[in-house]
């Protein structure tokens, strides 16, 4: 089991394979899967905030964007392009992309994930 400690803005989190997302990656929990490859998995959000709401998550256990390093730039690009390709396959031309980083931003699962939301007019500011 992979685990490490991450200090995220003076709060320490232990990243283990115990998040709901790591259980999805490991096949312990089923999901409405939209895509999977060697780097990531994408699935519909069970608590959808828009008519179309899916997540793209890396298989690499990263707590948040705050933790990402220069070496993760190809992975981050892959996650975004995977989401774009899923959106295009759903014939979407407009969508919102969201990455919450840390508790104050609304991150509730401490495994990096990118939200893709569409199907309605989005308001601004979002929060």
Stretches with model-predicted labels:
Residues 2-127:
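HIT superfamily nucleotide-processing domains
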């Amino acid at each position: 089991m992979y685990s490490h400690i991450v200090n995220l803005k003076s709060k320490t989190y232990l990243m283990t394979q115990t998040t709901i997302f790591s259980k999805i990656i490991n096949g312990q929990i089923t999901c409405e899967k939209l895509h999977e490859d060697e780097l990531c998995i994408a699935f519909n959000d069970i608590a959808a905030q828009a008519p179309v709401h899916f997540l793209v998550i890396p298989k690499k256990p990263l707590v948040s964007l705050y933790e990402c390093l220069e070496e993760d730039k190809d992975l981050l690009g892959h996650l975004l392009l995977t989401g774009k390709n899923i959106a295009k396959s759903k014939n979407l031309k407009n969508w919102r992309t969201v990455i919450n980083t840390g508790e104050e931003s609304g991150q509730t699962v401490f495994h990096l994930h990118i939200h893709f939301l569409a199907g309605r007019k989005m308001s601004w500011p979002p929060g």
